[in-house]
Amino acid sequence: MAGSGSCMKKSCVCCQKYLEHLDGKMNCFVRRMTADSRRSMIMPCKFVNHFGGDFSGTIKLQSPNGILYVVEVTKCKNKTVLRCGWEAFVDAHHIEENDSLLFRCVENSRFEVLIFDSDDCEKVFSCAGIRNTCKSIQEKSSSSCDDTAESSESEGFARNQKGSFSHRRKTANLASSSEDSGEDSPSEHESVESGDLETSQEPYVLSRRSYLSEFQKEKVDALIQEIQPETTAFVAIMRKSNVQLPTPFLVISFCYAEVHFPHKSVTVTLQRPCKSKKWHPRFYKRKDARMNILRGSWVEFVKDNRVQEQDICVFVPTKDARRNFTFTVHLLRVAAAYSWGGTGVDRAGSSLGRTDVKSASEISIKEEPIDQEENVSSRNRNGVSDESEEDEDSEGPAHPPYIVPCKSHLSRLQKKIVEEKVRSFQSKFPVYVAIMKKSNVERSASRCQLELGARFAAAVHLPDRRQTVVLQRRGERWATVMQIRSGTRRLLISGWHRFVRDNRLRVGDICLFEFKTHERWRLTMAVHAIFREQCC
């Protein structure tokens, strides 16, 4: 009996210690990664309710190597979702499907995260390449300014000790979102403490739902390495609304503006490297709408520097920016972003002439479905049926010189012209023949797209992931993006509308896609057009 009482006493002591550890709260939860968890993560309702549903604005995730990541928390369909910043955390730690994450709440809105692989073994992370960032966190912890590694849809770089950049991290992306139409519009963001960005080690912030192609990213990174800014720069890809006269405007990231721009509507100063002229646009701030806009004399900056759609403006705060709000603006031209040599930085602001690149591969990244189980419908967001355009390809023998989708049919004259063209190419790969339909030449950019057939994809080994595809025609290039739908369908979406518009394609025209090269980050195809008048 005495032994039994002793055991009970020890058990009570253990229980008491455990209760003290919990501090009366539910401190931990576990999430297993699924295919839908890469862009967003749903917090368990039971855990959120235990805290009275008090998770909004942002939280901080502390990774096993000590880096702090600021992640936006939003409410959607009565669910609490980790969104902006989450993908950067996932990418930085190479988190994969079936990995498990243990979140432990160590203080208000701050979580320690342990990461386990699919075998339930803890992943080990090194601080190599981000030593400066780790050091900054330790030094600044006493002043309550935590270093952050903010996130975006596009890839970025973290400084290491030698000033180079690591591909493991993401560029900050806490900007006002832009709609798929390409127009800027402010999005609602909860307030972030200014210290979160002020001590950030990220070299630049990229607007949310914007994407840098490999060409663009190389040029931006080269510029950042060259100028070595002491503070985080803001990278803006020019949209139609940013450069369209008579009243262009530019939306500034809410979180970036909180740190580097004034907290009220005032005039700011813009300057160009090696130029004496200054511009004084009006910085317009409206707190209730989380809206931060440059307007007014912004039009003069656009006109004087001949800023065009798809150009990239890199805003770097000057040393005294917190007092006089002055920014040096470096301009990367569209043509320069795709040039094969040099840094591509237009320092003098002079015109580079007509560009041979019609699109800088800017992508409007859409929010992924919140529900862990994706709702499959007969039509996707772009109005395209989830049912593939082809069940199998037709035309010709087992290894045909060209491939036509089974739902498309060539007339006798069309077939003759196509075969003559294909013979002249002498391509090692089958040529894809696409007869333009209404969905391929839509005036609306969000609905204009082209599917690449499954058999063609297999013949030229198209990747099963999103990929930049450069289209060539008559010495000019257009950057498009191939996206994956329903797991196997490959659609040219972003940039395809511009190709259609610039080449004046219409229903009934025929495009022949000749596969050229497949590098790691991009595909290149030559496109030969046969206009419908030629087949009459």
UniProtKB/Swiss-Prot annotation:
* Gene Ontology annotations for the cellular component aspect, listed alphabetically: nucleus
Composition-biased stretches, type Acidic residues, lie in 386-395
Q: Subcellular location, in the record's words?
A: Nucleus
Chain intervals for the UniProt region annotation (Disordered): 141-201, 363-405
State the Gene Ontology terms under molecular function: DNA binding
**Residues in the DNA-binding region annotation:** 26-119, 235-335, 435-529
One Pfam family recorded for the sequence:
B3
Keywords annotated in UniProt:
DNA-binding, Nucleus, Repeat, Transcription, Transcription regulation
Name the Gene3D superfamilies for this protein.
DNA-binding pseudobarrel domain
Output the InterPro entries linked to this UniProt entry: B3_DNA-bd, DNA-bd_pseudobarrel_sf, REM16-like
Coiled-coil residues: none
**Name the UniProt record assigns to this protein:** B3 domain-containing protein Os03g0619600
Top-level taxonomy: Eukaryota, Viridiplantae, Streptophyta, Embryophyta, Tracheophyta
